[in-house]
Amino acid sequence: MSLPIRNDSARHRDAEQPLAGDLALRRARLHEFCGPARVMLAALVMAKSRGPVVWIRPGWWPERLNAAGLQPIANPSRLLLVRADRDEAALWAAEEVLRSGTVPLVIAETAAAPGLTPIRRLHLAAEAGAEAARRDGGTAPLGLLLLPGQGGAPGVESRWHLAPAPSRSLLWSGGEIWTLTRLRARLAPPARWHLTHEPHGAERLEPLAAPD
């Protein structure tokens, strides 16, 4: 009689979403991206994920998410864009999609940092979605909250800041270099890296001095 063998390494991979290099985000939780390049960071995560992506944005913002600009990084055909008329509506939509367990990546942008209660609701929705996905053989959802400036939503699993870091050494290759900062995380200390993104999609992560 053959016995079922549990693949713990695969289970571990399914529990995390790659971010950059050996950095990863815990699924079934809500993480925060902030800084001037937060949309770029979300696009990089989207490129490493599989399945549909729901991206919720404030409907009153004049800026639009540019599918043509997204194309070199991630496939925009996977994207469902939702325009919310207020921050509360964006958070409600994110909560409902996370709870369904049918969408592996849910991205919500808001104009201001939510309070602790909405964040807790999003965590609970992501956990419920993970259970639903497990029953259906799917992937546990990951929630990303994009906030302007330094962010600051209470209770998030982790907070990441991305900003451009121009470098003459990359001008010849057409690559881009960013400063990626882990401002806080439940299971890791603050840290900082140079993240290099080349036109052909290759990435390089170089540690820097930790932020103060």
Q: What is the predicted role of each segment?
A:
Residues 102-167, 171:
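A contiguous pocket-lining binding segment that forms or flanks enzyme active sites
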Residues 51-52, 78, 142:
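Residues at the starts of beta-strands that form the adenosine-phosphate
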Residues 48, 96-100, 135-136:
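Conserved catalytic network of the ASCE P-loop NTPase/AAA+ motor domain
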Residues 33, 79, 106, 126, ...:
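Conserved RecA-like P-loop NTPase ATPase core
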Residues 144-206:
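Phosphate-binding/switch region of NTP-binding enzymes
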Residues 1-55, 59, 184:
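Detector for small/aliphatic-rich hydrophobic stretches
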Residues 1-11, 196-199, 206-212:
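Extreme N-terminal leader/targeting regions
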Residues 56-122, 150:
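Long, charge-dense
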